[in-house]
Amino acid sequence: MEIQFQQPNLQQHQKAGTKGGKFKGRNRNSNTNKFVGVRQRPSGRWVAEIKDTTQKIRMWLGTFETAEEAARAYDEAACLLRGSNTRTNFITHVSLDSPLASRIRNLLNNKKGNKKQEGVVDVGVDVDVPAPSASTTSTSSNTSNSDKNDHNSLSSGKVQNTMLFDDAYKPDLSNCKEDFQSCPPQSNFSWGFGPVFDRFPIAQILDMPKTDGMIDAASLELSEFERMKVERQISASLYAINGVHEYMETVQDSNETLWDLPPLCSLFC
């Protein structure tokens, strides 16, 4: 009875040992088939491919029957691209005359040519950018011409204004001066006309600035403004004197000898 119970246990241990041996064999085979830059297709053949991120290169090295052949192709391409210090699957000696070396050399030359063309395109763009400076110079010249035209129009307007001022009414004060000089010095006008003349500084008005024949437009415009100011003040003084004269006629007696004098308005006419 004891022997019958022990036999099933032995059979179970034997089955477990055979399963474990199978798993170990698979793991060993998978480890030996792993190479850098090599992968296996579903058909069973091996493919080698190399990538270089610094130079932006991805190169198909080909399809091989064994993983070792694909790994050696990868090692050769890696040494040509990155140098002898790169990571490889085997210790390899690169031959510069191999077809793979010529392929990699052509690929690198194409990459360099593309970079040079991109640099030439960039330089051309940089050279073409300053072209709008001509338009800016033309616009600046147009603005300067417009400013000159505006200045000329303003100066012509000032000249026209001065011509209009020349046609304005100018009172003649020659008779006023002659009548004032012909009046006797004994006459006293302190009875009511002193404050009137004090309000209108005619002496200051008559002192006009003496200018020569050659004057600029600014001084000419200023002299015209002063002349208009003088004319307005003189007309205001004449209105005030006439008003005082009429008031004195209504208040004072017309038989007084004072009113035998000529009208005061004739002094300033």
Curated annotation (Swiss-Prot):
Residues within the DNA-binding region(s): 34-91
GO MF entries: DNA binding; DNA-binding transcription factor activity
Annotated knockout phenotype: No visible phenotype under normal growth conditions, but roots of mutant plants are impaired in the interaction with rhizobia, formation of infection threads (ITs) and nodule development.
Xref: SMART domains: AP2
Induction details: Induced in nodules 7 days after rhizobial inoculation.
Top-level taxon of origin: Eukaryota
Family to which the UniProt record says this protein belongs: Belongs to the AP2/ERF transcription factor family. ERF subfamily.
Protein's cellular compartments: Nucleus
GO BP, one annotated term: regulation of DNA-templated transcription
UniProt feature, compositional bias: Low complexity: 128-146
Record key words, sorted: DNA-binding, Nodulation, Nucleus, Transcription, Transcription regulation
Protein name as annotated: Ethylene-responsive transcription factor ERN1
Keyword Kinase among record annotations: no
GO cellular component: nucleus
InterPro entries, sorted: AP2/ERF_dom, AP2/ERF_dom_sf, AP2/ERF_ERF_subfamily, DNA-bd_dom_sf
Organism: Lotus japonicus
Record region (Disordered): 1-36, 128-157
Organism classification: Eukaryota, Viridiplantae, Streptophyta, Embryophyta, Tracheophyta
Pfam entry (one): AP2
Biased composition (Polar residues): 1-15
Purpose: Transcription factor involved in the symbiotic nodule signaling pathway in response to rhizobial stimulation. Functions as a transcriptional regulator required for root infection by symbiotic rhizobia, infection thread (IT) formation, and nodule development. May coordinate these processes. Functions downstream of the CCAMK-CYCLOPS complex. Probably not involved in arbuscular mycorrhizal (AM) symbiosis.
